[in-house]
Amino acid sequence: MEEELPLFSGDSGKPVQATLSSLKMLDVGKWPIFSLCSEEELQLIRQACVFGSAGNEVLYTTVNDEIFVLGTNCCGCLGLGDVQSTIEPRRLDSLNGKKIACLSYGSGPHIVLATTEGEVFTWGHNAYSQLGNGTTNHGLVPCHISTNLSNKQVIEVACGSYHSLVLTSDGEVFAWGYNNSGQVGSGSTVNQPIPRRVTGCLQNKVVVTIACGQMCCMAVVDTGEVYVWGYNGNGQLGLGNSGNQPTPCRVAALQGIRVQRVACGYAHTLVLTDEGQVYAWGANSYGQLGTGNKSNQSYPTPVTVEKDRIIEIAACHSTHTSAAKTQGGHVYMWGQCRGQSVILPHLTHFSCTDDVFACFATPAVTWRLLSVEPDDHLTVAESLKREFDNPDTADLKFLVDGKYIYAHKVLLKIRCEHFRSSLEDNEDDIVEMSEFSYPVYRAFLEYLYTDSISLSPEEAVGLLDLATFYRENRLKKLCQQTIKQGICEENAIALLSAAVKYDAQDLEEFCFRFCINHLTVVTQTSGFAEMDHDLLKNFISKASRVGAFKN
């Protein structure tokens, strides 16, 4: 039965009825500010950001791409053209037709927003030119910022307390706003009224991600190096001292470590490496470094969460809270927690890091733009996904390791050449399978229904074997992508061997590069000691050609 739900539409911006068969909801109920919204309004939220000094400002988009705001509207941060507070959602008409790609906020607060087209809009507090429009007047409505960005596509934005940072698709970083500690990276301490490219050590680098603390900036380049600049009074730049840095400087203590992500709290920094390890440095008065004490650290310090690989880190410049998520789905938090100091990573009952900031952080803000894809009808692909392993509609079952997996002959024949021939004249409704394990074979069949895989990197090696055996090239590519996420120094040689065995060239090159980047440790592992002779010979030859053994 179809369900009737309200959709915002019309000149008034009030809900009108529309019929939807199903709808994915973004879970925002843990943030107190959303208690001001009706259940009907909450059902329509697709993206959301909570900000402000008390978590008292909200911007969200609906499933039909309208933007709404509510809150105290401090300094016009809601972009409505006035400074009137509102406890009811008001539509932000000035951004009508724009789709939000990413968004960040400052302490004033001010907002920096990038659209899916790569345009930048800013509004709100502007006493330090953090809006980048060349003035110090507060912006009551969104202003398109094009100076020095007119031919650029912005793909990521970040805000400090009163400065702004953006990253373009070609790996360039632009900054503007408050610069008393060098946080704009211009080499001076003069405020920057318009976007200016951050150069110096970044001049010939390709930046892949950025982050801002209250008064500092971080940039990760494509080689995995981290560059930092700005205020350093708490050691948040990780340079081993407390001196401010007016231009980008590489974090030398991370030499040989490839960083993938960076996140900044009020005055502390977290990074995530390609091996799933977290390092932290900076202020630690609330235990936000997770080191077991409250002593500041000016050098990167490992954070021990658990043996499982970390896949996500989270921090926000307006809080002293840290969070991380493991590959197994466990979420940990540490730092300031509702008036308490948690000095070691603490396992929560949450399934996402966003909930840590809703429930434990002060203020209760979002550390990133929350987002969920709209789902206003069931596609053919979604219908097929629902029917996988459904005994009610299946006409075939596989017996693997004593367990049944239910499937549909016609779909298997459509999706897989192997089944097209093997099931052609087969009238049996049970197929016994002993060549592969239950998790691997179930993942294979599920892939035929969903075009995706959900296995751990370790199990994906077995699926890679199956994909090679059945000549499923797309599945083979997906397996390689999954396996890459689980590589570490201890298993790198084993994964390299598997890549060679199953002729997975992309994975082979990835594993080889990983081994070269971590050569000293990899060559001391048991996997390297037990390496096949021919593989070892080829590895040494190839490593020599890329200069791995040069002094």
Curated annotation (Swiss-Prot):
UniProt domain BTB: residue ranges: 394-457
GO biological process, one term: cell population proliferation
Keyword tRNA processing: no
RCC1 repeat coordinates: 64-115, 117-169, 171-222, 223-274, 276-326, 328-382
MF term (GO), any: guanyl-nucleotide exchange factor activity
Keyword set, alphabetical order: Cytoplasmic vesicle, Repeat
An example Gene Ontology CC term for this record: cytoplasm
Keyword Repeat: yes
Primary location recorded for the protein, binned into one broad class: cytoplasm
SUPFAM superfamilies named among the record's database cross-references: POZ domain, RCC1/BLIP-II
Pfam families, per the entry: BTB, WD40_RLD
Xref: PANTHER family: BTK-BINDING PROTEIN-RELATED, RCC1 AND BTB DOMAIN CONTAINING PROTEIN 2
Free-text note regarding domains: The BTB domain might play a role in targeting to acrosomal vesicles.
Descriptive protein name: RCC1 and BTB domain-containing protein 2
Lineage: Eukaryota, Metazoa, Chordata, Craniata, Vertebrata
